[in-house]
Design a protein with these regions (language model features):
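A short, conserved structural fragment
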Residues: 46-55
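A short acidic, leucine-rich amphipathic alpha-helix
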Residues: 26-30
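Short alpha-helical segments that sit at the start of domains
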Residues: 1-12
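Short capping segments at the starts of secondary-structure elements
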Residues: 18-23
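Short amphipathic alpha-helical interaction segments
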Residues: 33-47
Length: 84
């Protein structure tokens, strides 16, 4: 039986996906989520200003500077832990 991913792992993956801008469909497929599950995460990331919504022909979500800093910190912690 495969264990569920942690909330932090999902958020980290979503921040990574949104670095170059991503629509909701791309986030859903690349993060292996469904549309019902992804909405609360998008709302949380928008509320915390870790991503921003950019309106154009399609609505794109892009990781903010604050989100990139958080992602870098998460990746640093993961690399430190993997060396133990």
């Amino acid at each position: 039986m495969k264990l569920k991913r942690s909330r932090e792992a999902i958020i980290s993956q979503m921040l990574s996906i949104c670095k170059s801008g991503a629509c909701k469909t791309r986030i859903v497929y690349q993060a292996n989520l469904n549309f019902r599950t992804v909405n609360p995460y998008i709302n949380l990331l928008l509320e915390k200003k870790l991503i921003e919504a950019k309106k154009g022909q399609t609505l794109l979500y892009e990781t903010t500077e604050k989100g990139i800093n958080l992602l870098d910190n998460i990746n640093h912690v993961h690399s430190e832990l993997s060396e133990l």
